[in-house]
Amino acid sequence: MERTKNKELLKIKKRIYNPNQKDIETYSASHAFSCANFQTFLPELKNTDHTTKFRDVVYSQAKAKYERININLIDNLDFSDLSLLEEKSYIMCSFHYGSYKMLASSLIKLNKKFFVVVNNSISKKHREDSHKYFLKCKNRYNNTVLNNIPTLSVQDNGFIFQVEKLLKEGSIMLIFIDGNSGTDGIMEYKGKNMSKISFFNNDIYVKSGLPAIAYIFKVPILPVIAYRENGIKIKSFDPIYPDLSISRKEFTSKTIQHLYDLLQKVIVKNPFEWEGWLYIHKWLDFEKLSNKEADKNQASTLIFNSRKYVSFIIKEKNFILDKDTHLSYEIGTNVQYAIDGEIDNLTKEELKMLIDKNILI
């Protein structure tokens, strides 16, 4: 069984790093936005490295899914840097980084009572698969405190009352704060309960309900990561206790910034194990980005400006994405040919537009 799973992962790796045309088209939009995200948040990364690093992110995501279903990996988890709190009830806050899908397994192995918070409703199949996996872990490690893993959606009626009930019963609340809006991790720009914070020298809007819950119910937050280094290691950071001497708004603002500062430090060490590069453009201040001035690079021969733009395909339609502003536009066949190096079919108006917008330089 173990060998079969390893073979499956190797197959996935091969498809990611040596994609066929169908795979390229499938990942086309994700690739484009990831390249733009690298340029915005990691400007020191060479443009020529964007595609390889995008594939590294996708492979890290694939490994996380593989790790979750490979129960044997739990046997060798390294807990030497994990310090759980003495309190029965607290919030374990993590990120979509590295081996994050192993955190629930860790709590089962450590015989802890916990529940998971997501944003959207979970499909029946996902619940069934998760429960089968839970039963395997429970039996393997003789967990005596859980019969199932309650999963709460923030969109459920009475969500906050369910959280209060479970915390009072002595459960740990497990939540992934970066992109906590469902299984795809996508957040809406300037949605409800969003805070503006600094992240890699850019302003982003993030969900801020987690610190408010800690403040209301007077429970600490324990930041935790699961990362790959000679195996899988679970590491905790200093706990954050609600400061009731300040307002809930001030505590929320300070805490959410602190949590993303922690995430940034983690990412700097190994940037491409964070899934957020696939969707962080959803959090950007687009109004601010739209005011960026276009590059004025000149060249004697017209070529596609791959530093500023990247093209992608969705449902057989061609688009171009501005990496600086994160705005995308549908383009016609002639423009796509020009991007590919064939400019003979362009009209004068199309050619002028491409030069004016620095798409061709």
Regions found by a protein language model. Give the residues of each.
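Long, charge-rich, low-complexity alpha-helical segments
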Residues: Y329-I361
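Short, basic, glycine/proline-bearing loop/turn elements
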Residues: Y141-T151, K192-F199
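Active-site glycine- and acidic-residue-rich loops that bind
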Residues: N148-I160
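Low-complexity, glycine/alanine/valine/leucine- and proline-rich hydrophobic stretches
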Residues: Y309-A338
